Amino acid sequence: MSSNGPRDEVFTTVLVNERGEVADWDAHRQRLEDHAGRLRIALPDEAPVLNVPLSSTWTLARISCAKNGAAWTIEQRTVGFRDEAIDAITHPAPRWNERTNGCKHGAWSPYNEARKAAEEAGCDAALLVHEHCIVDGDRATPMVLDEDGTVWMASVEEGGVAGITASVLERQLPRLGFPVVKGKLNERTVARCEEFILVGTGMGVCRVDSLDGELLGQTTVLSQRCQELLHEHFTEKATWSLPG
């Protein structure tokens, strides 16, 4: 795994089922191609080949390509906590330039350091802040339910990564009566929210019970509905495929 400059590597993290199939591979591949283009990294022509897990549980696979690499690098690991209530801290968001912000790239250590800071504070995740607004999570996408029933997400222009899981929910929530709006997740929006969740490939849908020691929200309706939507999504055969 590269730990140098952003243009040394591009990667994505996928969910793998017990048959070795990947969830939402087309979306992951499209994002890889987009990020690789922005980082000027040439991807291999052949598809990555994943090992079939040795258990009946889902796993995660980090699929990466180095700047000068001719092949994919794949690191598989178990899923940690998923679909749980968690506690979070705020942490300064890493910044590069407009072309690089929002890419999953080789200079990923600031995200890992944010996660470590959360763990050292006895928490589960870090919410990344730039100019007094939450722009991303250390490994998941923030979504906020306001008092009017609108779900707010930070726009990609704020510098966060466009999450694959978040995009699935963004498409499905309006049919359940939850309009989704892109905007700034400022202190007032977060403090007055009905519920704050983090969604991601590994975390699933986690309700953020507290942020920097302050309790958040009064309801669990958003987390429950999102968990139900993802359950439906992952039971659909079309969601899963072998990379190719």
Question: Which residue ranges define each predicted feature?
Answer:
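Active-site microenvironment for binding and transforming phosphate-containing groups
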Residues: 164
